[in-house]
Swiss-Prot record:
ZnF PHD-type span: 419-488
Molecular-function GO term, any one: phosphatidylinositol-4,5-bisphosphate binding
PANTHER family, per database record: V D J RECOMBINATION-ACTIVATING PROTEIN 2, V(D)J RECOMBINATION-ACTIVATING PROTEIN 2
Predominant place of localization: nucleus
Residues bound to Zn(2+) 1: C422, C426, H459, C462
Binding-site residues for Zn(2+) 2, renumbered to this chain: C449, H456, C482, H485
Gene label: rag2
Purpose of the protein: Core component of the RAG complex, a multiprotein complex that mediates the DNA cleavage phase during V(D)J recombination. V(D)J recombination assembles a diverse repertoire of immunoglobulin and T-cell receptor genes in developing B and T lymphocytes through rearrangement of different V (variable), in some cases D (diversity), and J (joining) gene segments.
Originating organism: Oncorhynchus mykiss
Protein name according to UniProt: V(D)J recombination-activating protein 2
Coiled coil: none
Protein's cellular compartments: Nucleus
GO biological process: B cell differentiation; T cell differentiation in thymus; V(D)J recombination
Gene Ontology, cellular component aspect: DNA recombinase complex; nucleus
Length: 533
C-alpha cells in the first residue's frame, strides 16, 4: 500500500469532480473533462499516462462511424467483458453536460483500432432503447448481470430535475431524487422494463454498485428527502434467462454509510477496496474497507488506510476513480492557494504490492462527486514506422511532446478578460464558478468600465448589478463606471457616432439625348395662355 503524489503536466484543469476513468485493452482513459471539448481533442476522451510521478494526458481520436459523445459528469457506467465475439467496452448512461443539461442516452464505447505507434482509436455508438426507459438522471449506477449465458443491465437511483409540471422559474435548477425504481435493459434487443420493489422506499444517489453473476449489491448512497447518508446495503437479484425478468431485493448487515466513494478491484476474485467518499455533508470518510462477494453474499471488513497527507485531511472535497489493479487516482482542489497555478493536486493510491498479478477490473465504479462545481484537429499518426523495437522502447517513444496534451497550446481565456481579477473583492473563481444570471452559460457576464486609459472590463456579479440593470446598460448607450471609479451606472451619455454623408454626383448618361428645348416668343406665350383660359 502506497500513496504517491502526482504532478499534472499542463492538464490539471481538465479533471473535475464527476469525471470517470475507463480501462480498455490495458490502457486508462479519462472521460468527462471540464467544459466542452476543444480543438486539440474534439472527442473529449484522453489517454492517461503515469510515469516518473507525472500525470499526462494524450488526446484520443474516434472512428469515422462514431457518434458524438458529450463530456458527461457523474454518469453511470459499467464495463462489458468480451462476449460472443463482441469486444470489451463500456456502457455509459445519463450524466450532466457542461450546460447542466441531464442526459438520458445510452452509449457504447469500444476500442476500434490501435496504430503501430500505440495510437488508440475509439468507437462510440448510441444504443436505442424501447419500453419503460429510465429518464434523464445523474449520480446513479449501471451494473451488468448475467445468468445462463444471457446478460442484462441494471439501472438504479440518481437525481434529475423536477417534473415539467412542477418546474417553475424559482426552482428551475432544483434537483430531486429519482423514484426508487429498478430498470432492466436487455442489451440484445434494447428493451427496458421498470420494477418497483417494496424494500426500496427512498431514492438514493452517489452510491456504489458491485455485481457478481446475477446479483447486484448497492452500498451507501445519499437521499435528498432524508438529507443524510443512511447506513444500508441492498442486494438485488435479477433472473434474466426467460421471459420477463424476475427481480427480488433483500437487506444486508453490516451496512455502510457512505456516498461518492471509489471502488477498485483487487486481483481476479470479486474483492474490492472502498476508499474516499463522504460520511456527512462536510465530513470525508478517511477509512478504507475491503468488500468480498462470494456465494454466501457480501462480506465487509475494515482495511488499513494509507497515510493521508495534510492537504488531503484538511481539504473539504476530493474525487477520483479506479485505475484497476488495486490502484486509484485521487484529486483535491487547491483551496485557498491562489498563488499556485495548479487547480488540483493528484495522488495515486496503490493497495497491491509489486509483483502481484493485476486482475481484470470487471466492475468499474468512478467517483460521482455530489458537489456541483462547475481546443485543432485530432493529432495525426506519425509517419515514422517502428520495426524491431522492444515493447518498452515503443512505450518510451510514444511519450513525446507531439502527442501529449498541453494546455499552453490552447487559447488563453484570461486574455479575453473572463477570468481576470477585476477588482480587489472579485468573487469569480474559474474552478468554482456557477451561472449567476439567466443569460450566462459558460462564462461570467462582464461590463465595460469607461474610466481610465482605455477602460477595463469587470464582472457584473462583482459590481452587484441586478439582471434588469445589466440588460438596460447593455442595450443603451450610457457609460458605466465600476465601484472603484465612482460606481455610477449612467454619468455621461456616449456621444452619437457622427457619420459623414457622402456626396454622390449622378453619373452622366452616355449616348442619351435630352429633351428638346423649344424657345417660345412672348407673343406665342400670350396666345397659349388665352387659348387655355
Amino acid at each position: 500500500m502506497s500513496l504517491q503524489p502526482l504532478t499534472a503536466v499542463n492538464c490539471g484543469s481538465l479533471l473535475q469532480p464527476g469525471c470517470s476513468l475507463l480501462q480498455l485493452d490495458g490502457d486508462i482513459f479519462l472521460f468527462g473533462q471540464k467544459g466542452w471539448p476543444r480543438r486539440s481533442c474534439p472527442t473529449g476522451v484522453f489517454g492517461v499516462r503515469l510515469k516518473h510521478g507525472e500525470l499526462k494526458l494524450r488526446p484520443i481520436s474516434s472512428s469515422n462511424d462514431s457518434c458524438y459523445l458529450p463530456p458527461l459528469r457523474c454518469p453511470a457506467l459499467t464495463r462489458l467483458e468480451p462476449h460472443d465475439g463482441h469486444p470489451e467496452g463500456y456502457l455509459i448512461h445519463g450524466g450532466r453536460t457542461p450546460n447542466n443539461e441531464i442526459s438520458s442516452s445510452l452509449y457504447l464505447l469500444t476500442l476500434d483500432s490501435r496504430g503501430c505507434n500505440r495510437k488508440v482509436t475509439l468507437r462510440c455508438q448510441e444504443r436505442e432503447l424501447v419500453g419503460e426507459q429510465p429518464g434523464p438522471r445523474y449520480g446513479h449506477t449501471l451494473s451488468m448481470v448475467q445468468s445462463l449465458g444471457k446478460r442484462a443491465c441494471v439501472v438504479f437511483g440518481g437525481r434529475s430535475y423536477m417534473p415539467a409540471g412542477e418546474r417553475t422559474t424559482e426552482n428551475w435548477n432544483s434537483v430531486v431524487d429519482c423514484p426508487p425504481q429498478v430498470f432492466i435493459i436487455d442489451l440484445e434487443f434494447g428493451c427496458c422494463s421498470a420494477h418497483t420493489l417494496p424494500e426500496l422506499t427512498d431514492g438514493q444517489s452517489f452510491h456504489l454498485a458491485l455485481a457478481r453473476d446475477d446479483y447486484v449489491y448497492f452500498l451507501g448512497g445519499q437521499s435528498l428527502s432524508l438529507d443524510f447518508r443512511p447506513p444500508r446495503v441492498y442486494s438485488l437479484r435479477d433472473g434474466v434467462p426467460e421471459g420477463k425478468p424476475a427481480v427480488s431485493c433483500s437487506t444486508w448487515t453490516p451496512s455502510m454509510s457512505i456516498s461518492s466513494a471509489i471502488a477498485t478491484r483487487v486481483g481476479p476474485s470479486h474483492e474490492f477496496i472502498i476508499l474516499g467518499g463522504y460520511q456527512l455533508e462536510t465530513q470525508k470518510r478517511m477509512e478504507c474497507s475491503s468488500v468480498v462477494l462470494d456465494d454466501s453474499g457480501i462480506n465487509i471488513e475494515p482495511r488499513e488506510a494509507p497515510e493521508w497527507t495534510g492537504e488531503i485531511k484538511h481539504n473539504h472535497t476530493w474525487f477520483g476513480g479506479s485505475m484497476g489493479g488495486g490502484s486509484a487516482l485521487i484529486g483535491i482542489p487547491s483551496e485557498g492557494r491562489q498563488a499556485t497555478p495548479e487547480a488540483h493536486y493528484f495522488y495515486q493510491v496503490c493497495f497491491q504490492k509489486e509483483g502481484e498479478g493485476k486482475g481484470e477490473d470487471g466492475n468499474q465504479v468512478c467517483s460521482q462527486e455530489s458537489t456541483d462545481f462547475e481546443d485543432s484537429a485530432p493529432l495525426e499518426d506519425s509517419e515514422e514506422l517502428y520495426f524491431g523495437r522492444e515493447p518498452h522502447e515503443l512505450e518510451d517513444s510514444s511519450e513525446g511532446e507531439g502527442d501529449t496534451y498541453n494546455e499552453e497550446d490552447e487559447e488563453d481565456e484570461s486574455q479575453t478578460g473572463y477570468w481576470v481579477k477585476c477588482c480587489l473583492g472579485c468573487q469569480v473563481d474559474p474552478n468554482t464558478w456557477e451561472p449567476y444570471y439567466s443569460t450566462e452559460l459558460l462564462r461570467p457576464a462582464m461590463i465595460y468600465c469607461s474610466k481610465g486609459e482605455g477602460g477595463h472590463w469587470v464582472h457584473a456579479q462583482c459590481m452587484e448589478l441586478t439582471e434588469g440593470l445589466l440588460v438596460r446598460l447593455s442595450q443603451g448607450n450610457g457609460k458605466y463606471f465600476c465601484l472603484d471609479h465612482g460606481g455610477l451606472p449612467r454619468q455621461e451619455m456616449t456621444p452619437p457616432r457622427q457619420v459623414l454623408s457622402l456626396k454622390r454626383s449622378p453619373m452622366k448618361p452616355q449616348h442619351r439625348k435630352g429633351p428638346m428645348m423649344r424657345r417660345m416668343t412672348p407673343a406665342k406665350k400670350r396666345f397659349f395662355r388665352r387659348l387655355f383660359e
